[in-house]
């Protein structure tokens, strides 16, 4: 692909991404910026007259667990906007743990996008080896363990009980799935392209790509660089971005500069119940002020928001910012779901986190570290942030982002991302890379 094909402005965007949740959007945006692509994240489908000057635009939706018809409609609206802005290639982004049951939305949305683009074939690749998500013979692993044997089997919204991505994909879509094995990927991008053509000629609609390591990601990125529609996690997008920037060079510092964290007070809000977030909360509350959200009060007490806000404001003298969390281990989560109902409890918690973020913004807080995709969506919407510029990475797939037109910075973390020290690391990066 010649270097002259790369964009210089809104009329020639390289890549348009449709992400099925907020943290997934910042995840992929962080990898694109990390390869030197100027990237903007827009929260929801923007107005028709919005002008954007970027190499890549990521549109974040809340389409992972909503009704299928809504997910399709919103995804097609995002595609239409990207097409109107002369986007050259399209990427449907979902989680590296796939997060989609047999009644899930990944298959239906993929089918709708293929049909809208007049295409018959695409790839499926949630792999993100740098975070331990690998695919072997079409099976998805997390740190060497089958996905269905990890904590994802207990996910409150999208429990993953089958690790075979081909089988999951076929259960919720209109076509057949095949596999490009790691032995083929080892042979290079030309071999992968040949194998993709063979699968398509056999009537396969979705090619699940094996990826065991970083070299595989780079090979796959080159192999799919000309496909009209690509679907996957941020790993494949990272490989694609590397292929593009090898041709034109990259300036990561310049790409990150627009999203440098603002100065100001910080709060941590954690709604994820993943294994890693439980470990992160435990590590942080051992050294910093932390308050567990009372689920019953979140549901039944309208004045509980005042209690939470007053507690956060009272921690201003502490060396480390305060943490408010609804994070809990699986057995406690199960008890909450049985007592209150999973959807009812989740909705109340998300709403309360949104209210709290809005209240703290009014009190002068400018940095929000948020754990959990649903929580991140609630906080972003409550803060009325329509889009982000993408800043420095805290951990693979988790950058600092800065509100467009608002002096607010957020770190929006998918549940299982980051190390146990993530909450500390996010603050360190903000203090080092923030506005001088």
From Swiss-Prot:
What's the catalysed reaction? 3-dehydro-L-erythronate + ATP = 3-dehydro-4-O-phospho-L-erythronate + ADP + H(+); 3-dehydro-D-erythronate + ATP = 3-dehydro-4-O-phospho-D-erythronate + ADP + H(+)
Q: Which GO terms describe its molecular function?
A: ATP binding; kinase activity
Keyword Kinase assigned to the entry: answer is yes
Q: Which domain of life is it from?
A: Bacteria
Query: EC number(s) in its UniProt entry?
Result: 2.7.1.217
**Pfam families noted in UniProt:** NBD_C, SBD_N
InterPro entries, per this entry? 4-carb_acid_sugar_kinase_N, 4-carb_acid_sugar_kinase_N_sf, NBD_C, NBD_C_sf, OtnK
User: Keywords for this entry?
Assistant: ATP-binding, Carbohydrate metabolism, Kinase, Nucleotide-binding, Transferase
Identify its protein family: Belongs to the four-carbon acid sugar kinase family.
The protein's job, in short, is: Catalyzes the ATP-dependent phosphorylation of 3-oxo-tetronate to 3-oxo-tetronate 4-phosphate.
Q: What is this protein called?
A: 3-oxo-tetronate kinase
- Which lineage do the record's taxonomy fields give for this organism? Bacteria, Pseudomonadati, Pseudomonadota, Alphaproteobacteria, Hyphomicrobiales
């Amino acid at each position: 692909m010649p270097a002259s094909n790369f964009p210089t402005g809104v009329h020639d965007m390289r890549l348009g991404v449709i992400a099925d949740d907020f943290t997934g959007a910042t995840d992929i945006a962080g990898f694109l910026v990390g390869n030197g692509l100027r990237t903007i994240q827009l929260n929801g489908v923007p107005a028709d007259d919005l002008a954007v000057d970027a190499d890549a635009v990521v549109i974040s939706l809340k389409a992972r667990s909503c009704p299928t018809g809504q997910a399709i409609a919103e995804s097609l609206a995002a595609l239409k906007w990207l097409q109107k802005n002369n986007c050259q290639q399209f990427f449907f982004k979902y989680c590296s743990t796939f997060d989609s049951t047999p009644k899930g939305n990944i298959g239906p949305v993929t089918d709708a996008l293929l049909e809208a683009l007049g295409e018959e074939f695409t790839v499926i690749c949630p792999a993100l080896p740098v975070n331990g998500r690998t695919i072997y013979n079409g099976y998805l692993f997390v740190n060497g363990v089958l996905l269905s044997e990890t904590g994802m089997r207990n996910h409150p919204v999208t429990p993953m009980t089958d690790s075979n991505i081909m089988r999951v994909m076929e259960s919720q879509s209109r076509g057949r799935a095949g596999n490009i094995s790691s032995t083929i990927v080892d042979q290079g991008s030309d071999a992968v392209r040949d194998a993709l053509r063979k699968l398509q000629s056999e009537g396969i609609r979705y090619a699940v790509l094996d990826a065991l390591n970083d070299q595989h990601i780079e090979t796959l990125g080159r192999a799919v660089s000309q496909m009209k529609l690509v679907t996957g996690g941020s790993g494949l997008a990272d490989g694609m971005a590397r292929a593009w920037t090898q041709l034109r060079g990259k300036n990561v510092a310049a790409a990150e500069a627009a999203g440098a964290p603002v100065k100001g007070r910080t709060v941590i809000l954690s709604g994820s119940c993943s294994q890693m977030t439980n470990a992160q909360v435990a590590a942080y509350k051992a050294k910093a002020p932390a308050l567990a959200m009372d689920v019953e009060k979140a549901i039944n007490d309208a004045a509980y928001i005042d209690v939470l806000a007053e507690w956060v404001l009272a921690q201003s003298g502490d060396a480390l910012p305060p943490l408010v969390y609804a994070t809990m281990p699986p057995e406690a989560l199960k008890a909450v779901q049985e007592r209150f109902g999973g959807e009812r409890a989740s909705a109340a918690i998300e709403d309360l986190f949104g209210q709290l973020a809005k209240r703290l913004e009014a009190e002068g807080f400018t940095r929000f570290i948020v754990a959990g995709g649903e929580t991140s969506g609630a906080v972003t919407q409550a803060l009325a942030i329509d889009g982000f510029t993408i800043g420095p990475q805290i951990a693979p797939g988790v950058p600092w982002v800065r509100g467009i037109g608002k002096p607010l910075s957020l770190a929006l973390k998918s549940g299982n991302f980051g190390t146990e020290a993530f909450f500390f690391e996010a603050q360190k990066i903000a203090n080092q890379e923030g506005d001088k």
